[in-house]
Amino acid sequence: MKIKFINYLLLFFIIFLNYNGFVKSDCYQELDLVLSNSCRNGPSKLVIHESIYSFESIELTPFVQPKLLNYYSWDLQDGINYFISYRYKNCSNIISKPFASKGMYYKLLAEPLCLNTYIPVRVYNWGAGGIEYNFYSVPSTIWVNSQNGLCSFQSPISPQSYTKGVLNDGALKFVGPTCGFKNGTITIDLTKGYSNYHLFLQSDYLFDNEIQPSSEGFYNGLESENYSLFVDSEQCATERIEIYMKDVFAPLEIDFENVPDLFHNSTISLSLSSGNNGILNNTNINAFVIQSERLLTDWNHVQTQITSNTYYGYAYNKDFSTEAGQTKCVYSETLLFDNYSPNFNFTISKSESCLENVSITFYPLPNQNIKVYDYSSESGIPFSMKDNVLSVENNLNLWIFDTNQNYGIVHSTVFDIPSYKIIETSNGIGCWKTYNITIVNYENYKNLRIHFYNENSEFNFYPVEGVFINVPALYYYVTYNAGDCETESYFVIDKLDRNTPMDNVVLEFNTLEIGNCTHETSFMVTVKSVFGSYSKTMQTFYDKEFTIFLPNCSCQINGIYVAPRLIDGDSLIYELLTDPNCNSTDTLIRFTSPSQDYSISSVYQNGVQLQYYNNLNGYYISSGENNITVNYEGDQYCYRTETITIQSVYEVPLVQITPVSDCRNPNGKIEISNFQIFYNLELVFNSNSKPINQGFIENLASGTYTINYYSNQTCINSITVYVPSSENVAEITTSVISNPTCDNGPFSDGMIRVALKYEGNQINNFTIQNQDAEFTYLNDGVYPIAGVGVNSLTISYLSCIWKRDITTVLNKPSFTLEKVFNDTCDLQSVYKLVSSNPNIEIDYIDSSNGFSYLNNYYLVFQNSGDFGYYVAWNSRCYEYYTQQIIMDNYDRDSNVKYIDYEIVKPDNCNSLKIDLIITNMNKFISLTIENKLPTPINSTHSIFKNLPPSKSYDILYTLLNGCVAYQTVGIDEFKSGFTKETIDIIKTSDICYSGKASIQLSNLDFDNYYYYIKNSNSLMGVTDSYDSIQPQQSGNINGTILLSNYNPGSYKIYRGCKSMANCYLETNVVIESEDPIIESISVTDSYDKLNNGTVEIKLNYNSPYPINFKIIGTQLSNQNGKFGNLTPKTYEVQVTLTDRMCPVTLSKSFTINLKTSPPTPSPQDPSDELSTSSFVQVNLLFLSILIFTIFIF
């Protein structure tokens, strides 16, 4: 009994020593605090290299979340004094210690009130001490390098107001000097609350030499330099304004005495806007026009060719000398000539027969070289013309091209175009829609059909009595033969819709034949949809993404077929190179690929990949039955599999394991049933060996052991066995504290909690380890590096080990960029990185545009676009992200328009000069168009005079706050032409899709202009087809012409000038189809009691089909709309149209009134009286003869 007690005492002492291996023996030992200071993109850090298992508790004040690795790490904010408090394991005392990082940080010594407020900034830990900077022009970022240049920081600053300040409220104005002179001025309006102004050259870095004002708030005599102006105000404190004083030139005016046109000379005159009385005049400067490449001796009536490359200006020596090589002042402007097309004047002559050619006569402009091609042909050979007359057949698309302008238009010689109506007949969405398409006067067209191409297939739909019924959404080619045409014509109706709602779509796959290394797998996919089922057979070696275009509609179905692994049915080709022997139970085997087209990519034995030994040219496989899979790769991937049995020369131990059931007194056991056949057996654990006598060994702790077995005295081999722990003695519960936020292999940033009870008691001092890793954690049951998926953990306590698989899922954060301040002008835009998961700790951003400050992370952008950046977080995660950045700065694509303007067009083409008036000039420092300066009118208005015609003008402007950008003007104004002229248009709408609409044009001048009508409907497969309007058409009286028989659609009426390129007019006309209406009801009232009222109903449409008129409540009905013998009362007439294009019913009320006497007859002319008198005399004679005859008989 005494010996047993001593044994228990020794066991307790051993356990106590093992437990306290994790406990500090010195409870008062101070920690070694390792501080790393922030430098460039990394924050300051505190690291403690002591094992995390040494502490009962540890914490920073102010609180900072630690990063748990095998040690503690914290990210710190510079400028904060911290305390660290900690208590060692098995100790009761708490130790506290102050510390602070020494990374650089700053404090603003003044508030950034306005954009240009001058701000003193104090930077700490810059070197041995601090340093002060003066900062201005916010929003921007402070960027400071340390004294030794090894570290830096960057931080965003934005002002409290973007709208206040000496620039924004117009209190500061400056005018640059005339080139070569010192007459620049700066004016400060002190009445707006400004004072204490000081001016320096920017090159005066120490601000020692102040420039004195000429008078209060006014500087004069300034030369072209860069200046720094300091101005004080209550609203913005001290502002620092950078003024770039540029040379100013007197605007040069150009007067077009005839309109600029391509490829021939124009006449221009030049003058200075300041006249000849200013500093500069035509006697001391030299003007030039660089197209003629000469200086002008006379500025008036200059003959020169003008193109879009023409520029003009003037130059002079700064001292007005005539010596060569002196410093020059040069001013130039570019002519914004933008030739407007089309510029083709032609007339068309067509026959009533389609078999006769179309004759087209062209009237070229000067220097115009016209070629005509077949638009649908790929030959590139133009048609031959004689004397500018072209004869071509009907139903062609012609490409009319000017080789000098490098521009062309399309004209279609289609013989006849059917009218049609399209009505949706389904309630579907997207490509599931269906339509009825009705062709007007379909009897006039032969071979009507809808031709449709879908993927590599063709489909045709045919009409029933001119109606294509329930046609799916398509891009229709409606083909036909018109009249006596032998050539087929077509027009296009676009009802294509790629939106494929998948709610009612089912994909079914059927593998028809599994492939092998040389033949693809064949499968069939069946699409079940609202249009029925459709099947398609495909072949593939791999997983296949596919798109199926359903027949007869525009729906395309996307899917993916997961191909089975391709297995080769042949046997493996292999060779056994060695036999098992005493030194190895493995056999060296070599595999051969089935053909020279394939190579062996990998070999697996019982699901475990085998290592290839280059020096031996083979693989080792173990004795016994082996399921071998050999993977091949060539043009595709495939595999062969086979069972290979290797007979072992020697026996192996047959092992039976008894688990550990007592963690304090290990009682695991290994038994070997065939121990008699071995020469010797021994157990190896942690490099220590112990003999196995009588075939068993006991009192083992849980763990992995190696059994060495000797077949004879010299032949030794080994096997590995694992002794588990009994599940009956422990209660283990696991839970996921947080899922990993990145998929970083088996070790990520997920956290798993493990709770252990042994013999009913809660256990705290156990370890957790991943079975595949060397990381061991004793952290109150927390495993902090869990990966995505299954985490195989071992839980160890005393002599016991248990295994658990815990599954986690990916909880990946998203990162977005949140704008810190608005981007303005050329200043940078700063965005802050924001995570969707506030619990993660960002480590750094890896980007050329990135920086961090005080544990916040930023990106800087100068323009719009898609930008990429890497983000690292939680010490273990790292990923690449992209985000689209759309800047709000000033550019021509911005929705913000700052320039208010008016465009004054000339009255007509005789003086084609454009004036552009700026009406808010007081909002800008400067405005230019290709260096051209406007002429001031007053404080708010200025004018660009005599601009050459162009589709638009790009104005370069500088706002009062210094922002420089472009704004494009004139696009909308010039769509209708360059003059104030108009074409008077009266249109009549189409009715019932009859194609009978008309367009009446007035104010036409066929002597000086030519006219197009541009059809924007898709015709012969081409949109924007041009047709010439010819003066010989009917209705051409006094400049008025009537265009008849037009279908519903969008048209443009275009007028071009016969003598110049840019004088055009363009007007949009939209024709819609309307239902008929009751145009009039003519009523004759009933008199006395005769019930003799009448009515006549007329429509605004003469249908070729019967129209039924019926008076409701009576038996009266007919097809001419005339009714008589009506009694006095109110009636309702109902009109029913049987027209197939618009089967509508109309109704309207009318009233027959009762009159007491007939209306007074209107006076008759003598011929009417004579006719009545003769009629009476004839009747009296006839009556006398009748009486006499009766008397005789």
Swiss-Prot record:
Keyword Lipid biosynthesis: no
Subcellular location: Membrane
Residues that span the membrane, as ranges: 1173-1193
Membrane-protein topology: Single-pass type I membrane protein
Primary location recorded for the protein, binned into one broad class: membrane
Extracellular side: 26-1172
Coiled coil: none
Protein's UniProt name: Putative uncharacterized protein DDB_G0271238
Species annotation: Dictyostelium discoideum
